[in-house]
Each structure stands twice: as C-alpha cells, then as structure tokens.
C-alpha cells in the first residue's frame, strides 16, 4: 500500500508524492508554488524533456528520471548510513527515510517539511516542534535525544544533535575520543578567524566529559525561520554543474544570481580555503560552503558563517599527506589543485596568525593525540605559513609587473 505525502516550504504546498516502502512511485508539482522548490530540484525546470512526463496549467508530473532526483534530495536530507552510532537513531525494522518522514522531515536549517496525507498538522505546529529542544543537561543524561525528530535531518558522518543553552540553540558534534583532533581543528580555525578580525564564522568550543576529556565541539545555530541555509552543492546541482573543473569559480557566480555579493563570496572562499590548508582540514566539500537565504524572498542575503573546519575521520592521517599533494574530500582531489584556484592569497594577514605555542596549547587538550602526530601537525602549520607567505610575495610581484 502506498503512502501519500506533501512537501511544504512554510505554508506553501510544493508537491505531492507517493511512497511504496522506500520507493517514490509518483510526484506532482504544484506550479502555483514552483518558486519554492528546493534548489536542487529546480534542475527539473531547466530540463523538462529529461524529467517531466506531463505538464498542464496547474501541475508538472515527473517521469522516472524526475522521481530519481526527488529521491536524491530526500536521501540527502536524512541521516546517512555511515553516521556514528547509526543504530541508536534507527530502531529495528525502520530506516532513516521513514524516521525522517515520521518526524515531518523538518529541519532547523531551512523551512521545508513533509506531511503524510493522513495528518492534520500545520506550519504553526511545525514551528512548535522546532522549538521543542532539550537543554544541554537533559541531552547528555538521556539517550532519548537520539530519537527526537529535530535531529532526523542532520547530515554528516559525525554524531550530532541540537540543544538549548540559556535559551539559545546550539549544535553539538560528537566524535570518538581517538579522533579528538577533529574537534581541535574547529577550535583552531575559530582562533585564526578571531585573530584575523573576521566575524563570519561559527565559533566552536570543546565539549568535554566528566573526566575532562574532549568528546566533541559546539557552536551556536546561525539559521532561523527567516534565514535558511543553502549550500554550494544546491547551487551547482540546479544546473548539473557539480562535476565541473571550475566549480570554485562557478560558486560565486551562481550565488550572485540569487542576490549574493560575488566579491564577498570570492573573498570568503579564498580565506576559508587558506585556513583549511593551514590546519589540514581535508573536508571542505560543496556541502560545507554555505549561504543564508531569506526564506520569504528566496534571495541570498549573505555568505553563511564558515562552519565544519574539523576535517573527516576517514582521511585523518591518511597518505599522501604533505605540503601540496594531500588528498582531500573537497572541491578538488588535492590541496594543490584547490590552491591553484585561489584568487587572492593576501586575504589572510599572516602577521595575525596564532603562534605555534597557541596552536600547541589547543592540541595539548587532546590527550588521545600522540606526541608524534602533534609535532607533525605543528610542523605542517609552520611549513604552510611559509608557503602562504611565498604565494603572497609571488602575487605582489605579479601585480607590480602588471602595473608596469
């Protein structure tokens, strides 16, 4: 028997789709609210011959290829199967998709939600559910937070959950203790941005357990009912451009089409790419470059605060790992490729970087980080600062030659 669902953006009903177990069997898009389609699904509108079966004045009916696009969007919204402690979230005889749909697929980072045809819930009630967030004490002492619907749309491999502290919403990312260095990178990145005088970043702090060992990191939420997160992946996927060699250059252009300041986007991308290079963050993929969109006008207002600078578990310490040939899970395959796209190395003030002692003091809080690995990371930091200085000199000489 098929289940019937409606996809909404706030109060706008966008489409109706049917689900047979985990398979989407049909979808009808409401043309009256077509502007509210999730950005990746707007690819349908640019390629109707490929994704549309029938179109009339009021609706668009998707063909099998169109249903695959919708399925991909839903899959990206649910928690991934490689999530740490996945089985704590997903009960027996259930799966991530059904758990998400049971909880209306709402998220704290955007205004989309999904309702079963048999439910009578409205958007005001969804907002109440969004606000039903545990405070930190109850979260860490009660495993039931794993099952709260507010966490059913949190992506990424690391275990994470929303909570409230002094009335403000925060995100906690947890990691096994042997990978505490991932949290250290978030804290180091925060220190670098602070010293640069750059404000548009998530200020991460360590989360420690009762024996004072690092088990995660936390930061304030930066989205709300009026400001939602869209990613570089969303912008690229709309035009099927995620695999292009010039994605670094395409992202600011596509963001500008929706209202972003192209120059500011370019500057922030250059800065975060350089900082990632300094701290060996190997995970700045398309989903980790974000923008804040006005949820009413659907226009980009600004770049999102820089988030997720900690790298990823499966690449921690993996070779090749050196000055330029380090493999990354990013816009390109290696750091060397990524650095070749940076427009302006002078966006970083090297004189304001944290000292090696300041970086070491952060690493020292990670007791599972071996002394050998710590010294290697500190060596990389110093070596990479020298590299950036040289790139800045090369660029300044090049600019001087152009003026002559």
Stretch-by-stretch model annotation:
Residues 1-274, 278, 292-404:
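Phosphate/dinucleotide-binding and metal-coordinating scaffold of catalytic cores
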Residues 281-282:
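Glycine-rich phosphate-binding P-loop
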Residues 285, 290-293:
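Conserved protein-kinase catalytic-loop segment immediately C-terminal to the catalytic Asp
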């Amino acid at each position: 028997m098929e289940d019937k669902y409606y996809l909404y953006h706030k109060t706008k009903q966008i489409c109706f789709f049917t689900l047979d177990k985990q398979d989407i069997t049909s979808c009808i898009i409401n043309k009256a609210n077509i502007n509210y389609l999730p950005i990746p699904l707007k690819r349908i509108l640019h390629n109707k011959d490929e994704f549309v079966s029938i179109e009339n004045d009021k609706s668009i009916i998707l063909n099998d290829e169109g249903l695959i696009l919708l399925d991909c969007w839903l899959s990206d919204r649910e928690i991934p199967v490689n999530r740490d402690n996945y089985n704590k979230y997903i009960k027996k005889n259930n799966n991530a998709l059904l758990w998400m749909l049971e909880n209306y697929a709402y998220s704290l980072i955007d205004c989309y939600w999904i309702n079963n045809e048999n439910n009578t819930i409205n958007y005001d009630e969804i907002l109440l559910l969004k606000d039903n967030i545990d405070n930190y004490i109850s979260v860490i002492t009660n495993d039931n937070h794993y099952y709260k619907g507010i966490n059913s749309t949190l992506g990424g491999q690391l275990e994470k959950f929303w909570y409230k502290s002094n009335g403000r919403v925060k995100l906690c990312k947890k990691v096994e203790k042997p990978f505490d260095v991932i949290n250290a990178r978030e804290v180091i990145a925060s220190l670098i941005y602070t010293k640069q005088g750059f404000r548009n970043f998530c200020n991460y702090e360590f989360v420690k357990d009762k024996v004072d060992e690092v088990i995660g990191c936390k930061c304030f939420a930066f989205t709300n009912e009026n400001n939602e997160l869209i990613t570089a992946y969303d912008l690229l996927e709309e035009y099927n451009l995620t695999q292009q060699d010039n994605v670094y250059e395409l992202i600011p252009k596509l963001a500008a089409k929706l209202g972003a300041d192209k120059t500011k986007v370019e500057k922030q991308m250059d800065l975060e790419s350089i900082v990632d290079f300094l701290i060996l963050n190997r995970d700045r993929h398309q989903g980790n470059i974000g923008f804040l969109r006005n949820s009413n006008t659907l226009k980009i207002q600004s770049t999102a605060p820089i988030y997720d600078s900690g790298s990823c578990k499966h690449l921690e310490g993996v070779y090749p790992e050196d000055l330029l040939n380090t493999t990354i899970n990013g816009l390109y395959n290696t750091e060397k490729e990524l650095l070749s796209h940076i427009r302006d190395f002078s966006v970083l003030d090297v004189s304001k970087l944290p000292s090696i002692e300041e970086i070491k003091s952060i690493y020292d809080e990670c007791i599972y980080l071996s002394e050998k690995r710590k010294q290697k990371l500190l060596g990389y930091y110093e070596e990479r600062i020298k590299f950036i200085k040289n790139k800045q000199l090369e660029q300044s000489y090049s600019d001087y030659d152009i003026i002559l």
